Amino acid sequence: MEENEVESSSDAAPRPGQPEEPSESGLGVGTSEAVSADSTDAATAPGLTEADDSGVGQSSDSGSRSVEEVSESISTEPLPQGYLPDSSSVSRGPVAEVPGGPPALVHSSALPDPSMLVSDCTASSSDLGSAIDKIIESTIGPDLIQSCITVTSGEEGGAETTQYLILQGPDDGAPMASSMSTSTLANSLAAIEALADGPTSTSTCLEPAEQPPGEPSSLAQPPAPVVEELDLQGLEAMMEVVVVQQFKCKMCQYRSSTKATLLRHMRERHFRPALAVAAAAAGKRGRVRKWGTSTKTTEEEGPEEEEEDDDIVDAGAIDDLEEDSDYNPAEDEPRGRQLRLQRPTPSTLRPRRRPGRPRKLPRLETSDLHDGIGEPLVSSQSTQSPPELQDLEAPSSSDLRALGKVGRGLVETGVSQSDAENAAPSCQDEADVPPRRRGRPSRRFLGKKYRKYYYKSPKPLLRPYLCRICGSRFLSHEDLRFHVNSHEAGDPQLFKCLQCSYRSRRWSSLKEHMFNHVGSKPYKCDECSYTSVYRKDVIRHAAVHSQDRKKRPDPTPKLSSFPCPVCGRVYPMQKRLTQHMKTHSTEKPHMCDKCGKSFKKRYTFKMHLLTHIQAVANRRFKCEFCEFVCEDKKALLNHQLSHVSDKPFKCSFCPYRTFREDFLLSHVAVKHTGAKPFACEYCHFSTRHKKNLRLHVRCRHANSFEEWGRRHPEEPPSRRRPFFSLQQIEELKQQHSAAPGPPLSSAGPEAPQEPAPFQPPETPPLLCPDALGGATIIYQQGAEESTAMATQTALDLLLNMSAQRELGATALQVAVVKSEDVEAELTSTARQPSSEDTTPRVVTLHVAESGSSVAAESQLGPSDLQQIALPPGPFSGASYSVITAPPVEGRASASGPPYREEPPGEAAQAVVVNDTLKEAGTHYIMAADGTQLHHIELTADGSISFPSPDTLAPGTKWPLLQCGGPPRDGPEVLSPTKTHHTGGSQGSSTPPPATSHALGLLVPHSPPSAAASSTKKFSCKVCSEAFPSRAEMESHKRAHAGPAAFKCPDCPFSARQWPEVRAHMAQHSSLRPHQCNQCSFASKNKKDLRRHMLTHTNEKPFSCHVCGQRFNRNGHLKFHIQRLHSIDGRKTGTSTARAPAQTIILNSEEETLATLHTAFQSNHGTLGTERLQQALSQEHIIVAQEQTVANQEEATYIQEITADGQTVQHLVTSDNQVQYIISQDGVQHLLPQEYVVVPDGHHIQVQEGQITHIQYEQGTPFLQESQIQYVPVSPSQQLVTQAQLEAAAHSAVTAVADAAMAQAQGLFGTEEAVPEHIQQLQHQGIEYDVITLSDD
């Protein structure tokens, strides 16, 4: 009882003559939901029809039936009996007869024994009700009374008996307050069913012993009447309180958690029509209840009902707006969730349902019954009972009396569905209207109650046809029908085309699509050709023709052509012109910090940066500055560029970046301070942007806009910052005008070209460290060789050197010296030289960076030259000389040559070595046929400029020049003319134009075969076949399968002629047989595959000795050093600046030895005087390249000794480049980047891990590349064995070999070699492998 308390209350019966007030349970005098009476009272009712006699439980003083009977007569379906807390189920209990009043129904569960039921005839019904109220209030408490059900029955005299029935449905799921047996509950249900069988049944209680098995007690035998006086105190033991959780109406599916709400629902939903009919016919006495809704006549309800025909009806009252929702009839069960028990509140404070028509019961048309009064009764079921089974409801006895007086012939009454049902008690008063707010009203004001306050336009609806699927409105019924048919399966958000399979989620998209089938848009402007899919667009467009708009000023026409100010080429876009302008400039602003390359375009620069990104693992790339990792190279590059952005000024509030600080300050002031600096002069408008202010003035102050616009002119649209300034454009114009090459020679004299004055050093050293620089290769021309052949031979050696491409901007020169006898033989055919013309002639070949070559011949008097005498070379019986000019202090005057003549014999033994040939802007003194001199200046681009003829000595003859590079597009260079007179007379001699493509000097009467053979620079060492390119020569050498046989290196095909194999190899050119086993990369040769494999291993074997950065290619390392760690783009050899070239005069062999010893010792300290003497006593050729060794530790010494001990070459390298070689006479010079020799007589040249040249000894077999295996060098291996050294000891150059071995054995010559030595070599960027030759 304490845990499950139930509130219950009752009101005292009102006295006759007093105004009727509503009770707490919601029932009044005239609205009882269950009235029970015996059959004797029912028989005395006058004027009852046959249908009335069939009722059950009629009152003794009225002809109306009870609520339960009406429900039973209407519904043909059995309702669930689990919901007992219903007002109609009260009459099914046993009857307690009370003297002086009608029998009162008592629930069987309240009686522990039927025999205990007491009947007291003397006790009044009011006293009984008061006594029961007191018992329940004392037992349960007044705060729990509201949850109990009260049933009131009235007498004609006004006395009422109130009986309290505490019920609980079996499906409520709430715990019972006290133990109530299931059999007792079954007895109650059986009694209810028994009472429905006939009107004269008397409710009795049977003894438990007399009940048949399985039958309820109320059906077995009526109980004996109780005649003893009712003990009011004893009733307390007869009461049992049960927790009430839910109440259900049996006439419909309405449910409620409180009894008062259910009773109010039954009174207003099911009993209101009977009261309305009675009041209208008999003039009901008394005023209308204050809490009831005002009764409306049929005439009053008619107009509003017609207006609301299309509303969706609702079948349930809502007593709480916040917690209850519209009831769904399909949900019969509470789905296991128990409703929260609410504490009842006074009716004035209780939330009311929103007024309006019921939402869930279908409304039927009103039928006139008995003078047009009454409506047909509507049940919750779809089928109705026959009219004879439908009964009238009698809310109270007083109402039934009125009905009996005015109309006994009423057949049936209906259920009122007026708007006033469930209205608040104060609905008669004028509703309080809240102050109207702007905007859309709240949801609480969307009901019909507030419709009268809405604004109703007198105009008819523009679109009267409404789609009930999606809510769209249309102008015509045809449009509505087409729209409804287009709905896909009734989906409001999906439309389909009726002529094709098109689907859309927008109605507008479907309309636009439908005109693809029609071919034209439906709406067209009457004054122009404008058409649209929508009529509203045409109406909006028509305003253009109807009103006089003020024309805006014509916008500034956009430029469609952008001419280049330099060359005049026209582009349609500004950015195209900007890109083109970069081609006129030599500036490369984007430089790679890894390899030093520069680029004009940023896009090309970014694409280049992708080559430096290396994979970490599994094709993933990691940022160099943070821990960011991704799988896309471009994404990583963009991320890394954010670390090193070229816009250093970044906003601290947003991602904005800029390259100017004032731009950043302006950005912060406008965007992040909230300031609006642009204010209107005519109003209070202000904005952050100037363009918005202009738009505001033009729209809001149109009359003043013209004047305002004159004071604030519109700025032209800002374009991208120009790439070139006006000054730069003018400079480019001047360069472009002078670009078409040197002008043609004219007959008149040219203005003298002022040379840069020479500044001799203050303290010249004995010999510069780079005295052997310039990559000047010295060859002696034999008597049987022509000048062209000698030049070609020298150039072949030069171009075959791998160091040729490492010099960068440094120019290369090849000087070919001709002896006196050869020179006299060559020049005799042209003219007879004078007696003094015995100076040897020098042929100088200048190779510029662009690839062009220029050959020149000159003669110099050797009297004032610094000389080095060397024995005759092996190529001819005569001696040879290399002559270049020392720095000239002044121009040659007309008085004669500045150098004195020497006997020819001495001149033949003279040699001068210096590095001035490679310096651009240097003046060289070159002689013609006689002893006269002239000056030639080498410019930076490789061209030769001649001084003015006025500055030359009389009788000077121009040398013969010939261009050996590819032909230029511009006009040929012609030399100035000068008259030359023999024997005091002057004559003219003009150098021939450089029209020949052959390399070498154009010699008079030279055979055509010599000039033709010079076109092919490279020759095979096996078959002596010449080739124009090195690549073709290498392909030819790889195909050699013997002296007179060729084989395809990629397949078994072989032939005896090279052209056949070459044609066959062309079939393999498109194939890529070498594939990477880790990705889809494939290459045509193994070299590219090996280079590609480094990207997977992330191996970078080449490191920079300056900054420590590592590279996977040696070429990248060299380019990096040249661009970043050099002065003016040249490689750094020493930390000090290079001193001007000096030439030292050596007139004896002792001075020569001393000078060479000093030079070698200052650089490397490897060769002594005796060893140099031994080396120079033999026939050697010194080949020198520019030296970049800064100290002794950076030098590396490599020794080559063949197995027979006949050939020795001593290579001194630094920075992975050959510095110089001292080799035996007659040995072909191999200058590789990486040089390894095996003791089988194979001289193998290796460049970047790829064999580029193999020299075979006599009688050795030829090997294919597949037969060569690369084995890494281990510290225990020896490149030069002791047996090889012993064999070399018997050769003619043992001293040189010993000297080289003495320096090299610390690195890799003896057994004591340690891993640190190998690491030292690898740190220097030199990788050496032992190459093993296999016989298979």
From Swiss-Prot:
It is found in: Nucleus. Residues 1-108, 199-222, 282-398, 415-442, 732-766, 961-1013 are annotated as: Disordered. Pfam families: zf-C2H2 (PF00096), zf-C2H2_6 (PF13912), zf-H2C2_5 (PF13909). InterPro entries: Zinc_finger/UBP_domain, Znf_C2H2_sf, Znf_C2H2_type. Residues 378-387 have a biased composition (Polar residues). GO terms for cellular component: histone methyltransferase complex; nucleus. A zinc finger (C2H2-type) spans 247-270, 465-487, 495-517, 523-545, 562-584, 590-612, 621-643, 649-672, 678-701, 1018-1040, 1046-1068, 1074-1096, 1102-1125. Residues 350-361 have a biased composition (Basic residues). Residues 362-373 have a biased composition (Basic and acidic residues). Residues 752-766 have a biased composition (Pro residues). There is a cross-link at K1021 (Glycyl lysine isopeptide (Lys-Gly) (interchain with G-Cter in SUMO2)). Keywords: Activator, Developmental protein, DNA-binding, Isopeptide bond, Metal-binding, Nucleus, Phosphoprotein, Repeat, Transcription, Transcription regulation, Ubl conjugation, Zinc, Zinc-finger. One of its GO terms (molecular function) is zinc ion binding. One of its GO terms (biological process) is brain development. Residues 300-331 have a biased composition (Acidic residues). The modification Phosphoserine is found at S975, S1006, S1148. Gene3D superfamilies: Classic Zinc Finger (3.30.160.60). It comes from the Eukaryota. PANTHER family: ZINC FINGER PROTEIN, ZINC FINGER PROTEIN 335. Belongs to the krueppel C2H2-type zinc-finger protein family. Interacts with NCOA6; may enhance ligand-dependent transcriptional activation by nuclear hormone receptors. Interacts with CNOT6. Interacts with CNOT9; the interaction is direct. Component of a nuclear receptor-mediated transcription complex composed of at least ZNF335, CCAR2 and EMSY; the complex stimulates the transcription of nuclear receptor target genes such as SOX9 and HOXA1. Within the complex interacts with EMSY and interacts (via C-terminus) with CCAR2. Interacts with members of histone H3'Lys4'(H3K4) methyltransferase complexes ASH2L, CXXC1, KMT2A/MLL1, RBBP5, SETD1A and WDR5. Component or associated component of some histone methyltransferase complexes may regulate transcription through recruitment of those complexes on gene promoters. Enhances ligand-dependent transcriptional activation by nuclear hormone receptors. Plays an important role in neural progenitor cell proliferation and self-renewal through the regulation of specific genes involved brain development, including REST. Also controls the expression of genes involved in somatic development and regulates, for instance, lymphoblast proliferation. This is Zinc finger protein 335. The gene is Znf335.
